[in-house]
Regions:
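Beta-strand/loop substructures that line and gate deep hydrophobic ligand-binding cavities in soluble
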Residues: 421-475
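SDR active-site strand-loop-helix element
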Residues: 8, 32, 74-75, 107-112, ...
Length: 493
């Protein structure tokens, strides 16, 4: 049955993945956003009604719920700073009042697993307070209390990812030994989509979690195994308060302190499924719930397949729910190291492309020959291929061709060449060249040349490798850009 659905938090991690799946299920979706421009690049933006509004303004909420059957409340304000818990409560009160007045038939809220009868962290206590406010609204409400959500872009998953990749050993405050029950984002979306059509007499809070109950330390080491990293030994610590831990997380990872602190606070408790009443309301997905390691594999699938573009946040919502989206936070996803150069030249795009396509082999790399030769020798000394392979053809390339210790991953003749490194490095590396027409300041026409070296480091060793080479990269890639452009200009003369 098609329903009219309002999604709050559509610019967020879960909302941005839920909205297109509700559309796919045949529902008519309205997305509420304070800044509708943030949804402009969403692949599904043309399939939904986007309305501007602020949940802290009751009149905005009343307009948003007009004519709606179901409200999905997916806004969490912990990244906003200040008294975010009070802001979340006010927003929930507005949603509850407006939904009741408008005759909304169902509210669905995504909260967090928490123990009963214990003093909770601010993060979990806020989730409980919001859920209770919505349950008391007089509108049939389902509160889904989820474990740690596993998928690229999820704040909890990104903290696991970055801590595991950066730390050679695992500091072990008490909460590293606490139990959690992670759940794959695909399974969270299964429950959310199904909740839109649950009979109206269903009302209450329901635990949802994956099939695995793990200590947080096991969660980090499970990620390490799936990411191809060594398991991290545990180093006991005498004391590490949530505040100190959040400072430390902020120092060694890109996860903002404002997000790290409430997440760490929630780890002070065992957060596991205590009842399975959800199975009587919404059956598990066909094939069963996804295990933790399987969820991590799904989250890393794009990166493992070599689809570097997804790591540059160009993935569309049509992909798997565990894939990254352009709307995910900038600190989410794999760490990407990059050296980018750009030049505008009077040479024609065709002339620049001819130089680019002939790179490597006997012509070399238009850079500092000594440094390039040293890199090739170093690769051979550790069992790599070095520079000895050359290239199949001196002037033409095709996908799959070898170019010294690179391989052509993608080529759009006349426009783009992307080479994937096959040298021995602690991570994965690419170099990409693009050429396009450009207007010169003098009024004539020429070409714009862009050059990017990209590195996805593996663990702390990969990061140290890149940082140690930054001075050499500055010389190598600066000279390369200058000489490629100069060669194209010389050819044109």
């Amino acid at each position: 049955m098609s329903r009219r659905i309002l999604v709050t938090g559509a610019t967020g991690y879960v909302g941005g993945r839920l909205a297109p799946r509700l559309v796919e299920a045949g529902h008519r979706v309205r997305a509420l956003a304070r800044d509708p421009g943030r949804l402009r690049d969403a692949a599904w933006a043309g399939d939904v009604e986007i309305v501007q509004g602020d949940l802290e303004v009751l009149a905005d909420v009343r307009r948003a719920v007009e004519g709606v059957d179901v409200v999905f409340h997916l806004v969490h304000a912990m990244s906003a700073g200040g008294d975010w818990a009070q802001a979340e409560l006010v927003q929930a009160q507005h949603v509850a009042a407006a939904a009741k007045a408008a005759g909304v038939q169902r509210i669905v809220y995504l909260a967090g697993l928490h123990p009963q009868g214990q003093r909770l962290s601010k993060h979990l206590a806020s989730r409980v307070a919001v859920g209770e406010t919505l349950l008391a609204s007089g509108v049939p409400t389902i509160v889904l209390e989820a474990g740690i959500v596993i998928g690229s872009g999820s704040a909890s998953f990104e903290m696991i990812r970055h801590l595991t990749e950066v730390l050679p050993y695992m500091p072990a405050p008490r909460w590293v030994r606490n139990f959690v029950q992670p759940i794959a984002i695909r399974d969270v979306l299964h429950y959310l989509v199904a909740a839109a059509e649950v009979p109206g007499d269903v009302h209450g809070a329901f635990d949802i979690g994956g099939p695995d109950v793990l200590r947080y330390g096991q969660v980090m080491n499970g990620y390490a195994v799936e990411a191809g990293l060594p398991q991290r030994p545990i180093a006991p610590l005498p004391v590490l308060t949530p505040w100190l831990a959040s400072q430390w997380v902020n120092l060694v990872t890109p996860v903002p302190r404002a997000i790290a602190m409430p997440l760490i606070g929630s780890l002070l408790h065992d957060c596991v499924v205590e009842e399975h009443r959800i199975d009587r309301v919404i059956p598990p997905p066909e094939g069963g719930l996804t295990g933790y390691r399987g969820a991590v594999r799904l989250a890393l699938a794009r990166e493992r397949s070599g689809d570097i573009e997804s790591s540059w946040r160009s993935a569309s919502s049509a992909g798997a729910p565990s894939d990254p989206l352009p709307s995910d936070p900038k600190w989410s996803g794999s760490t990407v190291m990059e050296d980018a150069r750009e030049r505008v030249t009077s040479a024609s795009p065709e002339a620049v492309w001819r130089v680019v396509e002939s790179i490597g082999g006997d012509r070399g790399w238009y850079s500092v020959p000594l440094l390039w030769s040293i890199r090739g020798l170093a690769d051979r000394l550790v069992g790599g291929v070095g520079l000895r392979r050359g290239r199949r053809d001196p002037v033409r390339l095709r996908a799959g061709d070898v170019v010294d210790f690179w391989r052509v991953e993608r080529i759009d003749h006349g426009r783009l060449l992307r080479l994937r490194a096959e040298m021995r490095v602690p991570g994965r590396a690419w170099i990409e060249f693009t050429v396009e027409p450009a207007q010169l300041e003098s009024g004539g026409s020429g070409a714009r040349y862009r050059q990017r070296a990209i590195f996805l480091p593996s663990g702390l060793g990969g990061r140290l490798y890149w940082w140690s080479l930054v001075p050499a990269h500055h010389v190598i890639f600066e000279v390369m850009a200058n000489r490629i452009v100069a060669a194209a200009e010389a050819e044109a003369r």
